[in-house]
């Protein structure tokens, strides 16, 4: 949907809310993470189906983020906790989808919510998370429209906000260099967080299952997995800080 040149009062209010949420997003994200473990009625008793389905959703989000970062990393992390962008990025995965990093974040959290088998999280928390990103995106669109003008308005006319355009995706990957090192040093924290969440949610689900014999006999494997993920995280972080690996 194209962004209107003159914003309505509702759009202006949403953009203002988006700017507020953007400034405080680093405080809000841990809250959403903790809410995964709040006691709630279950979605289903079929634990295996819910775990596999949720993991696939989160993994899809990770793939979207990897594609966005590996092909073209966008510097849009904010300046002085305000929405900011150095340049308008329209190539790479951004030629097919305007907000791949945000879509990836949403899929990752929604997938974790499904894995948590939590009715409360899926009915309340996930929609709130999506709304939060919708407001942040509206604030970014307002900023980018003012900064880049007609170029940006043409871009949003051609490229969807949420749904990726699949046509030409193969040609995009073939025409651009994919930088795995950049993915590694930019994405290791996000990957560590959601994979650790997956392990914790799995352990909680197994412990609460009617037949928790598998958890009682193999609970230590969850600890091994968390320890392994933390080790990998610290190794990559150390290599990044010492500039052994650079983008």
Name the predicted role of every residue range:
Residues 1-94, 106-247:
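Membrane-anchoring alpha-helices and their flanking helix-loop junctions
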Residues 99:
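Short, conserved phosphate/pyrophosphate- and ester-handling motifs at nucleotide-, phospho-/glycolipid
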